């Protein structure tokens, strides 16, 4: 269930994700007026920011092959492990693929780590 509120949630955000990926953190930006309440598995637990609403400490939803989130901006470039997860799941939906060829994500992970260091995480 999502309800609209006049005051927007505008924050940088850091999650500890429920996805089977490494690292376990997802960094991003949230800017939304909606407050979402769900019984589905969350994308992650909020370490910094507000998430789905101002009360339950979670962000996003994971249901089957679907991921919903309020995170936006450069979420995939700052979280290459999330990009790899999405690409792998999409390929596995049609093909017998077990893993992706590793790419050099050094710069992307530096951006991810710099974001975490801003909040001592």
Protein language model regions, located:
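Pocket-forming structural segment of enzyme catalytic cores
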Residues: 1-59
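Short, flexible turn/loop "capping" segments at secondary-structure junctions
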Residues: 60-64
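Acyltransferase
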Residues: 65-121
């Amino acid at each position: 269930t999502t309800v609209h509120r006049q005051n927007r949630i505008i924050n940088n955000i850091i999650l500890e994700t429920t996805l089977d990926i490494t690292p376990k953190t997802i960094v991003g930006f949230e800017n939304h007026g909606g407050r979402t309440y769900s019984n589905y598995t969350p994308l992650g637990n909020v370490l910094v920011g507000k998430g789905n609403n101002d009360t339950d400490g979670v962000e996003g939803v994971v249901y089957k092959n679907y991921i919903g989130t309020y995170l936006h901006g450069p979420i995939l470039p700052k979280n290459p492990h999330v990009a790899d997860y999405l690409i792998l799941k999409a390929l596995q939906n049609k093909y017998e693929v077990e893993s992706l060829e590793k790419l050099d994500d050094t710069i992307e992970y530096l951006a991810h780590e710099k974001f975490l260091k801003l909040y001592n995480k």
